[in-house]
Amino acid sequence: CVDEMVADVFGFNAVQLGLPEHDFLRASRIPFKCRVAPAGPAALRARLRDLPIASNSIDLLLLPHVLEFSVNPHQILREVQRVLMPEGHAVIVCFNPRSLWGVRRAFNRVPDAYPWDGHFIALPRLKDWLALLELEITGGRMGCYVPPFAQNTWIQRCRFMEAAGDRWWPI
């Protein structure tokens, strides 16, 4: 899903904020790619609320589940606005509280375990935040319709839900 979103973005500089253990920019054709995180195997270790990146310098900025686990997601979005070039692209990946994952989170017995300890952000709220920063939404995609099962067998049995999701459960 993320591979499709970053594959055709043109530019020279791409940055992934957070989750440095995973290379979500692997499908990007942009020549310079960097992972930034406060800890872990990141090429650049930095606080995401205060990026050591020049203003208007990034063509593609990827935020995989960063906002849900931030103390101040508004500040991170302000940094996104600052470092993105004009006509740059930000790909924001979030858990939807109005999904099967959100329902699972609401009834979770272990609330301090990842990803259930995050603050899932509803799409209308995210749209409001982006509008306040005058960031234009040019596209969007929902995904991960399969319920959050622990057993791979159940995940495979429910794989059909991915194809049906956008058609029958639009948000």
List the predicted regions and their residue ranges:
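A short SAM/SAH-binding and catalytic strip from SAM-dependent methyltransferases
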Residues: 59-74
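A short acidic, Gly/Pro-enriched loop at the edge of an enzyme's catalytic core
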Residues: 49-61
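Conserved class I S-adenosyl-L-methionine
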Residues: 89-117
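Short alpha-helix
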Residues: 117-140
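Class I SAM-dependent methyltransferase SAM/SAH-binding core
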Residues: 4-51
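A short glycine-rich, Lys/Arg-flanked "PGG" loop and its adjoining helix->strand segment in the class I
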Residues: 74-89
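A C-terminal cap/extension of S-adenosyl-L-methionine-dependent methyltransferases
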Residues: 142-171
